[in-house]
Amino acid sequence: MAIERTLSIVKPDAVEKNIIGKVISRFEKAGLKIVAAKMMHLTEEKARGFYAEHEGRPFFAGLVEFMTSGPVVVQVLEGENAIALNRELMGATNPAEAAEGTLRKDFADSVGRNAVYGSDSPASAEREINYFFDASEICPR
């Protein structure tokens, strides 16, 4: 099994609901370690840069507006097959289609307000982690 790192974001809707601890607890119970974390309010520029691959799509402006609407918690998770495990814990993008017991089924309101984000591949994880964190901010444990 491969030890991987993945980026996770607790989105503004979940922060507003005060469920950060519940989200983190699920990661830790599943065996993932948090090796970096910070709470921040994304600027429009930072959100646009992070979601640049979606620029030009109909949902882009709404996504940027939502992600800048309140604070987020950005973290790096580490563990065996962390990318796939995090995606399994999150559940389907649409909470109505998410499996019981997943973060999105339990905490998300809609496709647009779906509580959490996670990297979808090793290449994305590396790029996204580097977008938010300097190497000195990551604390292997």
UniProtKB/Swiss-Prot annotation:
Swiss-Prot/TrEMBL catalytic activity: a 2'-deoxyribonucleoside 5'-diphosphate + ATP = a 2'-deoxyribonucleoside 5'-triphosphate + ADP; a ribonucleoside 5'-diphosphate + ATP = a ribonucleoside 5'-triphosphate + ADP
One record GO biological process: GTP biosynthetic process
CC cofactor: Mg(2+)
Protein residues bound to ATP: K11, F59, R87, T93, R104, N114
Subunit structure, interactors included: Homotetramer.
Catalytic class of the enzyme: transferase
Function of the protein: Major role in the synthesis of nucleoside triphosphates other than ATP. The ATP gamma phosphate is transferred to the NDP beta phosphate via a ping-pong mechanism, using a phosphorylated active-site intermediate.
Listed name of the protein: Nucleoside diphosphate kinase
Short name of one Pfam family: NDK
Domain of life: Bacteria
SMART domains: NDK
